[in-house]
Amino acid sequence: MKIPVFLLLLALANAKVFQRCEWARVLKARGMDGYRGISLADWVCLSKWESQYNTNAINHNTDGSTDYGIFQINSRWWCNDDRIPTRNACNIKCSALQTDDVTVAINCAKRVVSDPQGIRAWVAWNRHCQNRDLSAYIAGCGL
């Protein structure tokens, strides 16, 4: 019983909740501003509505799949959580999306938007970011 609690605490210790401008700076430094024509503000908006900038975010879907990490990347298509059949197009374990090192999450997000659906693959972007003024998401960040 003590081991699962330890593992939970270990997972939480490796998670990070970014501040808006901090996250925008990380995304910009990792080449996300303009990647595949997607603005930095779009990425920040998407992350806000998907995870509240939380690398440890998790959401269980009605189809049995799970969304992981700051971008809420889905286990049916993009990562393997050993729970359901997966395409695993990013060729990663889903747990790699839930650490404070966002390299894997960013690389997988780049893979997601390389598909024809692009950023429209994210429901939160469609609902909260598409065709909106997103300037507030990077305002005051000095970018």
UniProtKB/Swiss-Prot annotation:
<protein>
    <recommendedName>
        <fullName>Lysozyme C</fullName>
        <ecNumber>3.2.1.17</ecNumber>
    </recommendedName>
</protein>
<dbReference type="GO" id="GO:0031640">
    <property type="term" value="P:killing of cells of another organism"/>
</dbReference>
<feature type="disulfide bond">
    <location>
        <begin position="90"/>
        <end position="108"/>
    </location>
</feature>
<feature type="active site">
    <location>
        <position position="50"/>
    </location>
</feature>
<comment type="similarity">
    <text>Belongs to the glycosyl hydrolase 22 family.</text>
</comment>
<dbReference type="GO" id="GO:0005576">
    <property type="term" value="C:extracellular region"/>
</dbReference>
<feature type="signal peptide">
    <location>
        <begin position="1"/>
        <end position="15"/>
    </location>
</feature>
<dbReference type="InterPro" id="IPR000974">
    <property type="entry name" value="Glyco_hydro_22_lys"/>
</dbReference>
<feature type="active site">
    <location>
        <position position="67"/>
    </location>
</feature>
<dbReference type="InterPro" id="IPR023346">
    <property type="entry name" value="Lysozyme-like_dom_sf"/>
</dbReference>
<keyword id="KW-0929">Antimicrobial</keyword>
<comment type="function">
    <text>Lysozymes have primarily a bacteriolytic function; those in tissues and body fluids are associated with the monocyte-macrophage system and enhance the activity of immunoagents.</text>
</comment>
<keyword id="KW-1015">Disulfide bond</keyword>
<dbReference type="GO" id="GO:0003796">
    <property type="term" value="F:lysozyme activity"/>
</dbReference>
<dbReference type="GO" id="GO:0042742">
    <property type="term" value="P:defense response to bacterium"/>
</dbReference>
<comment type="subunit">
    <text>Monomer.</text>
</comment>
<keyword id="KW-0081">Bacteriolytic enzyme</keyword>
<dbReference type="Pfam" id="PF00062">
    <property type="entry name" value="Lys"/>
</dbReference>
<feature type="domain" description="C-type lysozyme">
    <location>
        <begin position="16"/>
        <end position="143"/>
    </location>
</feature>
<feature type="disulfide bond">
    <location>
        <begin position="45"/>
        <end position="129"/>
    </location>
</feature>
<keyword id="KW-0732">Signal</keyword>
<keyword id="KW-0326">Glycosidase</keyword>
<keyword id="KW-0378">Hydrolase</keyword>
<feature type="disulfide bond">
    <location>
        <begin position="21"/>
        <end position="141"/>
    </location>
</feature>
<dbReference type="InterPro" id="IPR001916">
    <property type="entry name" value="Glyco_hydro_22"/>
</dbReference>
<feature type="disulfide bond">
    <location>
        <begin position="79"/>
        <end position="94"/>
    </location>
</feature>
<keyword id="KW-0964">Secreted</keyword>
